[in-house]
Amino acid sequence: MGQDGSPAHKRPSGSGGGLPTTTLTNGGGRGGRGGLLPRGRQMQKTFNNIKITILCGFVTILVLRGTIGVGNLGSSSADAVNQNIIEETNRILAEIRSDSDPTDLDEPQEGDMNPNATYVLGPKITDWDSQRKVWLNQNPEFPSTVNGKARILLLTGSPPKPCDNPIGDHYLLKSVKNKIDYCRLHGIEIVYNMAHLDKELAGYWAKLPMIRRLMLSHPEVEWIWWMDSDALFTDILFQIPLARYQKHNLVIHGYPDLLFDQKSWIALNTGSFLLRNCQWSLDLLDAWAPMGPKGPIRDEAGKVLTAYLKGRPAFEADDQSALIYLLLSQKDTWMEKVFVENQYYLHGFWEGLVDRYEEMIEKYHPGLGDERWPFVTHFVGCKPCGSYADYAVERCLKSMERAFNFADNQVLKLYGFSHRGLLSPKIKRIRNETVSPLEFVDKFDIRRTPVETKPQN
């Protein structure tokens, strides 16, 4: 999709554009006698030509009848209508992707970002904890805990424009369906964002202003949980062990040895993390954001990150590398409140997981969340919405289909159905209807099933 810059193929014109012709001179033909056939032979030749013409016409009618049918000869108008719809749809999609809007003519042009100015997400707030405490006391109908559990808001999203690859929109829909299922079953609120709240922080960085805005607009929420659109819940039963994080404000998947010993750029993964709604988190976002503005600032910051972090390719600054750099370079300021989680897969890299789903089904059960039955399968590098990816498109799409159906089977089980296979959208019945349906609710309802978790080291 998109413009590739290749020239359009046009029919040649001018001296070389027509069909080849032969110019006959006055003496042309065989010995100059081309038009001197006897009258009888001329009439016979004309009659033969007429017969050939009639025969060709008859054959043409037979061919048309065999391919489109006589009754379908009138379908050309319907085809024209369909073609017009396709062209109109493509035109609208092109306009949406172009960023042009005639209603924005009166809006002033945004100036370029000053590379010498430190970027800020918004007005500096220094007393958020006290402001939030007062608000919660004044609004008891919006408690920060529900049924004894801290209130969580899951934030995810995708770009405001249609995907470059049309099938990407289909997998975005499957991804949000998967997240809605998990949140519905675990009493978690969900926000799906498709807006760039700050044009300077597009791409990887778009999550930061949205997280901050949700914190300030929903003081009743205790945790904001960011999750990339290309990450799927694959253990629908598993629950975040929030009690483990009472003294922490950031929960992120990673490995301390890769972080502190190797300074690896993949020591942490920002595709799925939890951030507590508190002053500490606002301060972290303020410290995290300055590398994010697009343009020279992001480009120069990328060079710093590549030089500092092991294994990082040379490209513009991304939010994950910037967070790792911040936690390493200001360890005393931040790390006391950061929980680097690897007891379960808050982020699970897809390549080592998707081909083992059948083995997991045979040996284990949902609710484990770790390598035995991964909580989250994250399709890093697949970019189903983009026009390019780091892995083969077919491999990515088949793997995403397997992950979605693996998770969906856990949801469908309550209703007595399952996918026919991990690559099949079709479903089959796995148990018969009964006059006592509530026994299946008690047996299969995910909300009633106890969860096994690993002990903390």
Swiss-Prot record:
Highly expressed in roots, stems and cauline leaves, and at lower levels in rosette leaves, flowers and siliques. InterPro entries: Glyco_trans_34 (IPR008630), Nucleotide-diphossugar_trans (IPR029044). Its main location: Golgi. It is a single-pass type II membrane protein. Its EC number is 2.4.2.39, 2.4.-.-. Keywords: Glycoprotein, Glycosyltransferase, Golgi apparatus, Membrane, Signal-anchor, Transferase, Transmembrane, Transmembrane helix. Glycans are attached at N116, N432. Residues 73-457 are lumenal. Disruption phenotype: Root hair phenotype, characterized by short root hairs with bubble-like extrusions at the tip. Alteration of the main root cellular morphology. Reduced xyloglucan content. GO terms for molecular function: xyloglucan 6-xylosyltransferase activity. Signal peptide: none annotated. Residues 101-110 have a biased composition (Acidic residues). Belongs to the glycosyltransferase 34 family. Probable xyloglucan xylosyltransferase involved in the biosynthesis of xyloglucan in roots. May act in association with XXT1 and XXT2. Associates with other xyloglucan-synthesizing enzymes to form multiprotein complexes for xyloglucan synthesis in the Golgi. This is Probable xyloglucan 6-xylosyltransferase 5. The gene is XXT5.
